[in-house]
Amino acid sequence: MAILGIGTDIVEIARIHTVLVRCGERFIDRILSPIEYKQYHQQNNSVHFLAKRFAVKEAAAKALGTGICHGIAFVQFELFHDERGKPQLRLHEQAAQLARERHITRMHVTLADERYYTCAMVIFEGDIRSNDYSIQPNWYLSKIKP
């Protein structure tokens, strides 16, 4: 098992609020999956809810190696929590297909948020031997030898 992708994102919550005021439902529809959309309308602090999902989806797209482009959209990533409250990701459509092609078998998600910012990190793991990545296992040894 090897790390195949790492992505991180930090979001200023006030920026999400500004975009939400300016764009309204268009922004929400672009970011949230149908399940998240239902949850969003049940939240007391909907801006924080939206900011967390925005950060996680940006981080996940970076971990895939694409960012939000090339057919990968925010709505293709869905944040949910397991029975213990641990954040998890569910991938849909092109994001799920790309994860299968890259043999990603495990996903790790972590979130941190404060009053003004929210931060997310996503790590994808899988079998490196079944990927196209050209890794030189001892590249660092030649860098540190005198």
From Swiss-Prot:
Annotated catalysed reactions: apo-[ACP] + CoA = holo-[ACP] + adenosine 3',5'-bisphosphate + H(+)
Residues that coordinate or bind Mg(2+): D9, E58
Gene3D superfamilies named in the record: 4'-phosphopantetheinyl transferase domain (3.90.470.20)
Pfam families: ACPS
Cleavable signal peptide: none
EC number(s) given by UniProt: 2.7.8.7
Compartments, as annotated in UniProt: Cytoplasm
Family per record: Belongs to the P-Pant transferase superfamily. AcpS family.
Record-given protein name: Holo-[acyl-carrier-protein] synthase
Species name: Baumannia cicadellinicola subsp. Homalodisca coagulata
